[in-house]
Amino acid sequence: MLEKIVAAVRAAGDMIRDAHNIERDTREKTGAADLVTKYDVAVQEFLHRELLGICPEADFFGEEGQHTTLTKDWAFIVDPIDGTTNFVRELHYSNIAVALCCRGEVRYAVVYNPFIEDLFAAEKGCGATLNGRPIHVSGHDAAHAICMCGSTIYDRSYTDRSFAIMRWLYDHTLDFRRFGSAQLD
């Protein structure tokens, strides 16, 4: 199953890697910091077809519409382009993310940055890989090893609370970085 999901996500990656005139085909979704492009929609439509072809008994929940009430045991959860602002600005730090859940529990997950061809894949109980190589937690003390990463929120009314949390994280870890793609961060 994981290999089939990976193949679909890689094919979708070709669509965004080859994108042109991105800014022209962009609109605001909920505000200036929450964008959607024609590529978000096209990638989601492609993944909708491909993933339900792999697992037709699953529901499909995508960020760019096509929301459905999840009534089946299995469900695909899809973010067609995470880091859309980066994508629009042609900063190659965006990704496609797909999870296949069973009764609310993630069983398979894939996060793919097609610009640098980094593909993270995981199957519950089998570990995670980066480009096919197993990855592991380092085992170092968190305060000296973790560079916390985070993303902003679209609702500015949460800014003070969000920054307070970031400050606490900064004080309790090695460093804090924010690159604009929550899943890659």
What role is predicted for each listed range?
Residues 1-81:
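N-terminal subdomain of lithium-sensitive/metallo-dependent phosphomonoesterases centered on the IMPase/IPPase/PAP
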Residues 24-27, 128, 173-177:
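Short secondary-structure junctions
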Residues 70-129:
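DPxDG-like acidic metal-binding loop motif
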Residues 107, 135-137:
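Short, isolated positions in well-ordered beta-strands
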Residues 137-185:
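An extended, acidic
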